[in-house]
From Swiss-Prot:
<dbReference type="GO" id="GO:0005525">
    <property type="term" value="F:GTP binding"/>
</dbReference>
<dbReference type="Pfam" id="PF03764">
    <property type="entry name" value="EFG_IV"/>
</dbReference>
<dbReference type="InterPro" id="IPR009000">
    <property type="entry name" value="Transl_B-barrel_sf"/>
</dbReference>
<dbReference type="InterPro" id="IPR031157">
    <property type="entry name" value="G_TR_CS"/>
</dbReference>
<keyword id="KW-0547">Nucleotide-binding</keyword>
<dbReference type="GO" id="GO:0006412">
    <property type="term" value="P:translation"/>
</dbReference>
<keyword id="KW-0342">GTP-binding</keyword>
<dbReference type="GO" id="GO:0046677">
    <property type="term" value="P:response to antibiotic"/>
</dbReference>
<comment type="function">
    <text>Abolishes the inhibitory effect of tetracyclin on protein synthesis by a non-covalent modification of the ribosomes.</text>
</comment>
<dbReference type="InterPro" id="IPR020568">
    <property type="entry name" value="Ribosomal_Su5_D2-typ_SF"/>
</dbReference>
<protein>
    <recommendedName>
        <fullName>Tetracycline resistance protein TetO</fullName>
    </recommendedName>
</protein>
<dbReference type="InterPro" id="IPR035647">
    <property type="entry name" value="EFG_III/V"/>
</dbReference>
<dbReference type="InterPro" id="IPR053905">
    <property type="entry name" value="EF-G-like_DII"/>
</dbReference>
<dbReference type="Pfam" id="PF22042">
    <property type="entry name" value="EF-G_D2"/>
</dbReference>
<feature type="binding site">
    <location>
        <begin position="128"/>
        <end position="131"/>
    </location>
    <ligand>
        <name>GTP</name>
    </ligand>
</feature>
<feature type="binding site">
    <location>
        <begin position="10"/>
        <end position="17"/>
    </location>
    <ligand>
        <name>GTP</name>
    </ligand>
</feature>
<comment type="similarity">
    <text>Belongs to the TRAFAC class translation factor GTPase superfamily. Classic translation factor GTPase family. TetM/TetO subfamily.</text>
</comment>
Length: 639
């Protein structure tokens, strides 16, 4: 059986949830379609999902059409950052991108299409709501060509009389895009030679599979118009990315969820082979797991199963597997564009309105962060505050919605701040000697520190011989140094430097590894004071698409937001601006873009890295440590 993993993507109110229900209903998977208004749909059941068009809880549902099984996978992704959208698409074999016939191309549509193109995922356009009044389809086509891609092929005609209907487009003009993109076909056309329809269809299919040609279909999901034709196209056009004839197992975890009873489930895409109940599967060089229970999506529901075939989705109860964990032979994993998860760039504190809900909040954050690599949290051991690190404002909206609707927790969140970093300005050394006040530890430690190019991270080297200082003491020094790097002179993480352990001395038998572990961060701090540090802040690459009249406004606003516009291009009555901007300014820049373009502007962002901060230095309160703070202050007085 052919299995296709399909994503349905759309901007808010384009009809994604209604289309999913219509596909299930028309295929016979369900007896009647669910209602968005009544909250009976199988996907997007949370309030924020409906309001913002954001998928929060992954829902995998499926239907069967003849000998083809189609898994519909909702693709969660924080629209703040492209990297997260890319990650959520990596499991798909193909996508249907909805365009509302009434609303046309929206900003979110363009962001999603940009991601689909980057990932080279075969994509069909489905123009929904064609039965509404005042629809101008030729204008929608022009807008698609101008704002999405000129490489579209309209596969259907929409009739108006005696009632709205959808039929196949048999005009030869539809093939112009296919002919113009192929030299051999173009040469035939120019010389007046006849075409074989099979030649055109073969070239159309080749470019569709490569993600460079986009067929356009039409319908009304609400009234099940054009849905049967869409199902037939999905079943015939999309291929599974699973290699044929490969019996060895390969699967990858793409989602982690917790049930209401707090059971942990992992979603696995099987790329090759077959997974059986009671199989023992390798997940690393040293670790294996036994499959004791498994479910697969079948006709709109999840059912227990003894097997999961190549290409299918399987849900396993498991406490060991992590996001992106590989089951079986990782060599068989398809080679797709690798998207590295960006670092969280914002942080804030979160608290409960009712003190008795604190433990529930901590448990909820543990579960949410387990399935979201862009969310991290810790509890300050002294203030007991819960500190969240995250990527963007949409992500925080999602977290709050999940806390309220799934865990019934009311949370208060402070205004977030950007996460800065510190980098030494110059090379420096510092040594604290044993039995020299105010050193209370039975250890001597000497460290040197020097700056490295931005983006290098922290490099550590010991220049003290193991014959002179044994491994346990050396390990303790490294642990202390890494702990000291967590907070520099301004309270931010230290990065982009090389730290060398230059000198160490111990007294036998009184010295212990703890002496070296506690002294090392104090020595590091003194070395940093001699070196001085500069503050680094996260910068983003941005790409703005906006009406031409926005150009002067963009240049006018750029200095206010510390933005640097590096290139400008005019295309199809639109201006394309590329540049760099501090992460702390992007939200206001986006808000202004939306306001001045009446929602037509699109801003795509990707993390560039850290650069020297502009403006005044922002300090972060140092986390207390009762074991070393007194000694730190004593050395601070000596300085």
């Amino acid at each position: 059986m052919k299995i296709i993993n399909l994503g349905i993507l759309a901007h808010v109110d384009a009809g994604k949830t209604t289309l999913t229900e219509s596909l299930l209903y028309t295929s016979g998977a369900i007896a009647e379609p669910g209602s968005v208004d009544k909250g009976t749909t199988r996907t997007d059941t949370m309030n924020l999902e409906r309001q913002r068009g954001i998928t929060i809880q992954t829902a995998v549902t499926s239907f069967q059409w003849e000998d083809v099984k189609v898994n519909i996978i909702d693709t969660p992704g924080h629209m703040d950052f492209l990297a997260e959208v890319y990650r959520s698409l990596s499991v798909l074999d193909g996508a249907v991108l909805l365009v509302s016939a009434k609303d046309g191309i929206q900003a979110q549509t363009r962001i999603l299409f940009h991601a689909l193109q980057t990932m080279k995922i075969p994509t069909i356009f489905f123009i929904n709501k064609i039965d509404q009044e005042g629809i101008d389809l030729p204008m929608v086509y022009r807008e698609m060509k101008a704002k999405l891609s000129s490489e579209i092929i309209v596969k259907q005609k929409v009739g108006q009389h005696p009632h709205i209907n959808v039929t196949d487009n048999d005009d030869m003009e539809q093939w112009d895009t296919v002919i113009m993109g192929n030299d051999e076909l173009l040469e035939k056309y120019m010389s007046g030679k006849p075409f074989k329809m099979s030649e055109l269809e073969q070239e159309e299919n080749r470019r569709f599979q490569n993600g460079t040609l986009f067929p356009v279909y039409h319908g009304s999901a609400k009234n099940n118009l054009g849905i049967r034709q869409l199902i037939e196209v999905i079943a015939s056009k999309f291929y599974s990315s699973t290699p044929e004839g490969q019996s060895e197992l390969c699967g990858q975890v793409f989602k982690i969820e917790y049930s209401e009873k707090r059971r942990r489930f992992v979603y696995v895409r099987i790329y090759s082979g077959t997974l059986h109940l009671r199989d023992v599967i390798r997940i690393s060089e040293k670790e294996k797991i036994k499959i004791t229970e498994m479910c697969v999506p079948t006709n709109g529901e999840l059912y227990s199963s003894d097997t999961a075939c190549s290409g299918d989705i399987v849900i396993l109860p498991n406490d060991v597997l992590q996001l992106n964990s590989i089951l079986g032979n990782e060599i068989l994993l398809p080679q797709r564009k690798f998207i590295e998860n960006p670092l969280p760039m914002l942080q804030t504190t979160i608290a409960v309105k009712k003190s008795e809900q604190r433990e529930i909040l901590l448990g909820a954050l543990t579960e949410i962060s387990d399935g979201d690599p862009l969310l991290k949290y810790y509890v300050d051991t002294t203030t007991h505050e819960i500190i969240l690190s995250f990527l963007g404002n949409v992500q925080m909206e999602v977290i709050c919605a999940i806390l309220e609707e799934k865990y019934h927790v009311e949370a208060e969140i402070k205004e977030p701040t950007v996460i800065y970093m510190e980098r030494p300005l110059r090379k420096a050394e510092y040594t604290i000697h044993i039995e020299v006040p105010p050193n209370p530890f039975w250890a001597s430690v000497g460290l040197s520190i020097e700056p490295l190019p931005i983006g290098s991270g922290v490099q550590y080297e010991s220049r003290v011989s193991l014959g002179y200082l044994n491994q346990s003491f050396q390990n303790a020094v490294m642990e202390g140094v890494l702990y000291g790097c967590e907070q520099g002179l301004y309270g931010w993480k230290v990065t982009d430097c090389k730290i060398c352990f230059e000198y160490g001395l111990y007294y036998s038998p009184v010295s212990t590894p703890a002496d070296f572990r506690l002294l090392s961060p104090i020595v590091l701090e003194q070395a940093l004071k001699k070196a001085g540090t500069e503050l680094l802040e996260p910068y983003l690459h941005f790409e703005i698409y906006a009406p031409q009249e926005y150009l002067s406004r963009a240049y006018h606003d750029a200095p206010r937001y510390c933005a640097d516009i590096v290139s400008t291009q005019i295309k199809n009555d639109e201006v394309i601006l590329k540049g760099e901007i501090p992460a702390r300014c992007i939200q206001e820049y986006r808000n202004d873009l939306t306001y001045f373009t009446n929602g037509q502007g699109v801003c795509l962002t990707e993390l560039k890295g850290y650069q020297p901060a502009i403006g005044k230095f922002i300090c972060q309160p140092r986390r207390p440590n009762s074991r070393i703070d007194k000694v730190r202050h004593m050395f601070h007085k000596l300085a």
